[in-house]
Amino acid sequence: MRVSNILFVAGSASLALAAPVRENKRAASNGTFTFLGINESGPEFGETNLPGTLGTDYVWPTLSTIDTFLPKFNIFRINILMERLTHDSMTASLDATYLADLKKTVNYITNKGAYAMIVPHNYGRFSGSVISDVDAFGTWWSNVATEFANNTQVVFDINNEFHDMDQDVVVKLNQAGIDAIRGAGATSQYITVEGNSWTGAWSWKTSGNADSMGDLTDTQEGKLIYQMHQYLDSDSSGTSETCVSTTIGQERLEAATTWLKNNNKKGLLGEFAGGNNDQCKTAVKGMLDYMKENNDVWQGALWWAAGPWWGDYMYSMEPTDGVAYTSYLDILASYA
């Protein structure tokens, strides 16, 4: 989501955009998708105040709300900031407090049998600058993956929504992340990669992603997933509660679906949402129905987003009175 275009009133915060467990994965009850879940937002808030103060600049998910989504939903995408784990540089030591809070959240989720996806919500930036040091980026991921290498239900998401970057750099950063994670001993976990141009599904073939991202390699068979995001407003930014049409969800996935099939790749819709109105609800259901029909390539989807500081945000899935929680929860659960 292009959160730089949105202003949220979320408490006093400004918005930014492990222990081993038994392998008791929660799968969708009717086999529709491998993954169906929710983004958890808050640890990435307050990106202009680094490292920031917990409770003032950023917040961690309220763990008890995870139980509200189980057993229908089996994956939670935890949005963090790279700079809060390594303050001064990507190769710095991990901050013990932020890491401990991340582990607490991850372990709570995975001990419930669900997947916890860790994603640096950094848009391919570190401390405000586009990441170009591929080796340092790999070091960051090596250090982080080492902490979760024994937790089979962690999913690693290389970076949230690269944009306005040299395509070759985006590919190299993704590959460096994959290699670093595997090199750290995290060999059983899924990894999701993201493309340039906000990793949009609708622009996957026109952005350069289709021409270059397919060459990524992973030593672990069947564990690499291409994560795309898709919103249904006029510019796909997720900044409006208005959806273009009742069929826009399916339409914006069609070209990407063809690419996934033609290239023998697996896809995941890591962010999606729609406004609280009939047109959007029909569009969201149409999109999920289309993904269900093509679940040979589409592995699942995650709603954007839950989190304790969303207030009356139009897409809030925060229990129990979030706008989307009261209007979309049953719709999404029907695909579990």
Please give the residue ranges for each predicted region:
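Extracellular glycoside hydrolase catalytic/binding regions
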Residues: 54, 58, 139-142, 146, ...
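Acidic carboxylate-rich catalytic motifs and surrounding loops in phosphoryl-/glycosyl-chemistry enzymes
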Residues: 272-273, 304-308
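Active-site mouth of glycoside hydrolases
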Residues: 27-213, 298-299
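Fungal secretory targeting signals
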Residues: 1-25
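Extracellular low-complexity, O-glycosylation-prone Ser/Thr/Pro/Gly-rich "stalks"
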Residues: 17-34, 39, 45-57, 311-336
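Short loop/turn segments at secondary-structure transitions that flank enzyme active sites
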Residues: 44, 232, 307
